[in-house]
Amino acid sequence: DFGGKMPEGWIDIIVKAISLGLNIASGMHSRLSSFDEISKAAIKHGVKLHDLRYNNIEFDTGKGLKRTGKRLLTVGTDCSVGKKYTALAVEKAMLEKNMKVSFKATGQTGVLIAENGIAIDAIVSDFISGAVEWLSPDNDRDHWDIIEGQGSLFHPSFAGVSLGLLHGSQPDAFIVCHEPTRTQMRGVEAAMPSIGDVIEQTVQCGKLTNKNIHCIGIALNTSN
């Protein structure tokens, strides 16, 4: 589901998997434990339920104070245009050059890949920027955090998450991710913004926490 809700048709399948002794990991907004059938089955068969979007960390509000180290954020013209892929590709290339670098996951799939991180769209809005400050704290002057972007500043549904992520990331640099063949934003009746518009808006909004923010590249998703 586009909004992260658990489809009813999945419940029986999940219960069946539990009966076979499988632990269950879910990236949905709907918590596995909120479904009685799933919760009871997990207890009966002694398996673990992992809700990847949730954790027990109490985040503070963002403070916008300058942190040591360098940060790069991937931003997008829309959802699902390659922000995670780009971030991972950049991290890999920098590691091959023996640079100090870490991928910082902000979505459930990224958390699965990195085995750590935060699903930022499940954080209460007041604490989004603070959660990202926690995720990317002070570091060595020559260390880069490559932060996975979410949504788009131009998406009517998810721009709030994107903006909080931008402010908390305090990026020195950003890469714009874009799918050239896409004409309409995912899930809404809205035209795609131009790459130029995204660069301009990201710089304008990003200056709140880093006056030196700048675009260093464009990543094109040519899979479609």
Segments the model singles out, each with a brief description of its role:
Residues G3-G4, W10-R71:
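Extreme N-terminal, non-catalytic leader segments
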Residues D12-I18, R71, F103, T109, ...:
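Non-transmembrane, aqueous-exposed alpha-helical and coiled segments at domain scale
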Residues E37-I38, T61-G64, Y85-A87, I113-G117, ...:
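Short acidic, glycine/serine/threonine-rich loops at helix termini
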Residues R71, E91-D126:
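N-terminal phosphate/diphosphate-binding loop that engages ATP/GTP or pyrophosphate donors
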Residues N23-H29, L73-V81, I118-A122:
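Flexible, glycine/proline-enriched loop segments at strand-loop-helix junctions
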Residues K5-W10, S80-L88, L112, L153-F158:
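Short glycine/serine/threonine-rich phosphate/pyrophosphate-binding segments
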Residues F59-K97, V101:
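Walker A (P-loop) phosphate-binding motif
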Residues S26, S30-L32, K40, L49-F59, ...:
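Conserved catalytic-core segment of NTP-binding enzymes
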